């Protein structure tokens, strides 16, 4: 059950729309490359019971968005007649449906999983979505940060809380005395994992492919950065953390399985959230058995309500503390697109643009 949150908006009636009122959106009606994305003026509707309507200010783009759009091949039948893409966003509540508590018109919010098992994501000016996927944006936290919290930060939170010994929640001191290896620290999830792990008190090591990405990981807060292309990454990590790594946040398990076994501490956990580099992992049984290594796969769509609620609360607390800031200065360059160029935004993410891709949907 969604925990009600404090509201600073008005508790009066929702704003009604005139019949036939429309707003700009991007839709697709078949799977395929970014050319299937088309502009459309969609009717603005009242939120149903348990829903709110959000005026989206910024929409965040993640790899899952273009992968959902692509499907397993072009021309697949969709579950809905048309789909508005993008899971994450931030904006202002414009209307509140019946049976919603703790949210009100005028509240600044961040949203996540907006398009999961639903046809309407955040690539549109107004979106109706379950109140359970809407979270108060803390005072002083920008819409850019809010639109960057969902998939990246909540995935990172889950990855950092799957160890056998816990913790299940993150806060200052929660990972005190632990060592965390973040594979690919210049990506959006890696960036959030570095920030959250350091906030929680861990010693944070990250692997990168070059000095530019290394500088970004350092700006995010990594204590140690290892360039895996220029030396012996396992030896370098072992020198930095002689006791071994307690928890790996893993983006490329097929490529890094041997490295993880070489640097893991006893009873290390490897949290796998992506399949960069291949879908099949080959594990050397003996070293992993000796370490009692634990592999835990992470997918936000199926982690369960308790994990989502925990992530909501802890990610919001971290954002309020200034921990999850975005932009070049904090290691995550922003790449902005207008709503009309959503296809280009999807292409940027699909092509591996370093940083966070955001779509400006409406004014603040």
Explain the meaning of each model-derived region.
Residues 147-230:
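Mid-domain Rossmann-like dinucleotide-binding core that forms the NAD(H)/NADP(H) cofactor-binding site
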Residues 43-61, 72-115:
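Glycine-rich beta-strand-centered segment in the early N-terminal region that forms part
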């Amino acid at each position: 059950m969604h925990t009600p949150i404090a509201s600073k908006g008005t508790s009066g009636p929702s704003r009604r729309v005139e019949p036939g009122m429309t707003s700009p959106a991007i839709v697709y009606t078949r799977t395929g490359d970014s050319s299937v994305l088309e502009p459309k003026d969609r009717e603005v509707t009242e939120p149903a019971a348990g829903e709110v309507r959000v005026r989206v200010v910024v929409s965040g783009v993640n790899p899952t968005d273009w992968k959902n759009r692509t499907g397993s091949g072009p021309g697949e039948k969709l579950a809905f007649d048309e789909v508005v893409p993008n899971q994450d966003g931030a904006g202002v509540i414009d209307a509140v449906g019946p049976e919603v508590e703790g949210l009100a018109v005028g509240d600044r919010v961040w949203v996540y999983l907006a398009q999961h098992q639903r046809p309407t994501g955040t690539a549109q000016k107004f979106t109706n979505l379950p109140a359970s996927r809407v979270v108060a944006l803390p005072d002083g936290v920008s819409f850019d940060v809010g639109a960057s919290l969902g998939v990246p930060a909540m995935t990172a939170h889950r990855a950092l809380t799957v160890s056998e010994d816990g913790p299940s929640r993150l806060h200052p001191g929660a990972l005190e005395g632990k060592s965390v290896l973040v594979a690919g620290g210049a990506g959006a999830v890696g960036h959030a994992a570095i920030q959250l792990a350091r906030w929680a008190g861990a010693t944070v090591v990250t692997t990168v492919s070059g000095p530019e990405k290394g500088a970004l990981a350092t700006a995010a807060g990594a204590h140690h950065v290892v360039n895996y292309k220029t030396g012996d990454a396992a030896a370098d990590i072992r020198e930095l953390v002689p006791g071994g790594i307690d928890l790996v946040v893993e983006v490329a398990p097929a490529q890094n399985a041997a490295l993880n076994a070489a640097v893991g501490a006893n009873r290390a956990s490897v949290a796998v959230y992506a399949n960069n580099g291949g879908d099949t992992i080959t594990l050397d049984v003996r070293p992993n058995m000796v370490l009692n290594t634990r592999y835990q796969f992470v997918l936000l769509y199926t982690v369960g309500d308790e994990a989502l609620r925990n992530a909501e609360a802890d990610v919001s607390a971290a954002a309020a503390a200034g921990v999850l800031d975005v932009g070049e200065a904090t290691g995550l360059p922003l790449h902005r697109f207008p709503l009309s160029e959503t296809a280009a935004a999807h292409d940027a993410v699909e092509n591996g643009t370093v940083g966070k891709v955001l779509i400006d949907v409406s004014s603040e």
